[in-house]
Amino acid sequence: MKVQKKFLLQGAILLFLGLGLGFGLGSFYASAPVIGCRENDLTPIPDEGFISPAASEVPAGSVPETPPAPPDKWVCLTFDDGPSKTTPDVLAALNAAEVKATFFVVATGYNEKYLPLLAEAEAAGHQIAFHSASHEYSDIYRSPDAYWQDLALLKERIAPYVHTEGIRYLRFPGGSTNTVSRRYGGKGIMSELKAQAAEKGFTSVDWNVCAEDAVGGKPSASTIYRNVVRETGEQTQCIVLMHDSATTHTTAEALPDIIQWYRDQGFTFCRVEQVLPTP
């Protein structure tokens, strides 16, 4: 039953994303259930596809700016939970391949000595985005105020190294549809946080391809590569979840093959900010 449900959901995503190509650039909205990753651990990006801005969002008498259209096939490589001792190897692989990525960063205190790597990543043209200061579900999901306090602390800790005022993208720990947060903040905590994020001008970013590099067992580089290929399937618009934490060094080893595979399939590499607009 679980396998059948997974295939049905993936089919729905493929259909909806295919239809979405007929629309202008817009936002992914978080509404999809978990696909391809462990429940309560990882969540996919939702399946709404591209939509045009609502007429009410365009001031009367003005001509809205038209952002560049994304390529027909694009992929965003995203990395959570860094910087760490793994990050230099990830940056080396990306830079060698001339690929730009998006890093959803943490500042837990344990990785303080690696925070200067954020300046290196930003200087190389990679996108820096918010993840969490603590990444402790029991702390950040106690209440909306607790979440925003955590984000403010993250911003403060990374401010010496990157331009934090311009960061308008974030990724909720566990994804925007995680259910583990209900243990601490109640059933409606994520809906409330998503609404508040939009009100504050943030775009929350999930994913539809999971490398499964942080689900336990320390998977090999070849396993991570196969996971990415399998999860991509026939999709043509992909946000790939990977990690550059201290325990996911094999992710860096898998990157050259992952990048080459996407290139062979005709994908263009993009930063998240190039394909998903802010509210």
Regions found by a protein language model. Give the residues of each.
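Extended, non-globular alpha-helical segments
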Residues: 35-40, 64, 231
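Hydrophobic alpha-helical membrane-insertion segments, chiefly the h-region
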Residues: 17-28
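N-terminal Sec-pathway targeting helices
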Residues: 1-18
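C-terminal domain-boundary segment and adjacent tail
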Residues: 26, 31-35, 44-46, 69, ...
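Catalytic domains of cell-wall/extracellular-matrix polysaccharide-remodeling enzymes
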Residues: 135-241, 245-261, 267-268, 274-277
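Intrinsically disordered, low-complexity Ser/Thr/Pro-rich tracts
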Residues: 1, 5, 37, 41-43, ...
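Active-site beta->alpha N-cap acidic-glycine motif
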Residues: 41-172, 275-277
